[in-house]
Amino acid sequence: MITSIFGKVTFVGKRKIIVEHNWISYWFNTKENHKFEKNLEKNKQIFCHIIKKIVANQIIEEAFAFNTLEEKEWFCRLIELNGIGSKTALNLLNNDLEEIKQYILENNYSALCGINGVNNKIARALLSLEIFEKSENNKNIKGVQVADGYDELFETLKSLGYKQQEIQDALKMIEVKPDFDISQLVAEVIKLMSFKNNEITNKTA
């Protein structure tokens, strides 16, 4: 599989670039805050990944370009996760990857949910991302358990009639541990939401 090519960047758009390689021009999809610059004189190393899919009995290829090998590796890992496609993966690359990695290692589900473009399902998928060393497998298991706790808590509160946004705001203020007690967590979150609602009421009174 091709890891990178050397070519001239002949066009730079918001989420696409054109690279000329061996007298052939290729379209590449990119993340929004990429650092590619147009240069018709010098060849540049472009880290790339090709996705092939069948659409209407035809093989369609999509090419993606990255500034660094690290970005390419993250993209390849992300698209292997359930619920994360190429578009979502590119959006995630717009964030601080070291920050995301740290949140994953800390099993910090609520912090992941606070990242731009990350919802509950994506945060859960990220916690299962295999960026851990073999000696840290136990952390990975705990991360999944914590994600299960947040999911159960979210669904329980939603069934009680609370709005999605107020639930998400409250979840960012609590910590779920692997040995969580769902009834205690529900009571804690309801208390937080009630306190917040009272604050809003007092300010508007």
UniProtKB/Swiss-Prot annotation:
Gene that this sequence comes from: ruvA
Knocked-out gene: effects: Not essential, it can be deleted.
Disulphide bonds in the chain: none
Protein's recorded name: Holliday junction branch migration complex subunit RuvA
Source taxon at top rank: Bacteria
PANTHER family associated with the record: PROTEIN SMG
Entries under Pfam families matching the protein: HHH_5, RuvA_C
Subcellular location: Cytoplasm
Gene3D superfamilies registered for this protein in UniProt: 5' to 3' exonuclease, C-terminal subdomain
Region Domain III, annotated ranges: 150-205
Subunit structure: Homotetramer. Forms an RuvA(8)-RuvB(12)-Holliday junction (HJ) complex. HJ DNA is sandwiched between 2 RuvA tetramers; dsDNA enters through RuvA and exits via RuvB. An RuvB hexamer assembles on each DNA strand where it exits the tetramer. Each RuvB hexamer is contacted by two RuvA subunits (via domain III) on 2 adjacent RuvB subunits; this complex drives branch migration. In the full resolvosome a probable DNA-RuvA(4)-RuvB(12)-RuvC(2) complex forms which resolves the HJ.
